Amino acid sequence: IIKSNLNLSKKTKLVVVPTTAGSGAEVTSNAVIYINKIKYSVESEKLIPDNFFLIAEYVKGLKKSIKSSSGFDAISQSIESLMSLKSTKESIVFAKKSLNFSLTNYLNFYKNPTNLNTSAMCIAANLSGKAINISKTIAPHAVSYPFSVYYNLSHGHAVSLNLEKFLLFNFLNQDKSLASF
């Protein structure tokens, strides 16, 4: 990971409008760059936009493949945030709220998008971004990158290939004293 010791300077305000309902990048300090199929992560508080606007109309008409991939990314980020050793009370609140929005609206957003369920998925993605900005993602995201790079699989779909296996592994190997939520 390339950390913020790059001495980056902000010369202007950054205002963003997400065009998917998935990554929550509008509230995170992380970026990913691929060079020759090698993933480089950049992390700096200076990467967090100064402002953002969640506009359902820009997301509502996306192809179903993009909706399913980005929606699953938000769901996975929330689940991973809950499982992360770096989770905090604040990240857990964000992750649980995100999952509530996601699990209530994902199927309708995918099948019959309305401004209401699309807005809910945009909020879910934003909350998942807030959660992982604190806790970071864990193994399911890390393992997904080769699937995207070498098999041209979308990010959310790549994560979906292995999340279940990690959940099962962690469930079977959990410390029973930690199973409070």
Functional labels for PLM-detected ranges:
Residues T12-P18, A31, D50-F52, D73, ...:
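Structural motif
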Residues V149-F181:
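Gly/Pro-rich interdomain helix-loop hinge
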Residues I1, S78-I79, S102-N105, A125-S128, ...:
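Buried hydrophobic packing segments
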Residues G22, L127-S154:
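Glycine-rich phosphate/pyrophosphate-binding beta-alpha loops
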Residues N30-S135:
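Carboxylate- and glycine-rich phosphate/diphosphate-binding segment that chelates Mg2+/Mn2+
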Residues I2-Y34:
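Proline/glycine-rich low-complexity loops and linkers
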Residues F72, L99, P140, V159-S160, ...:
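A general structural signal for well-ordered alpha-helical segments in protein cores
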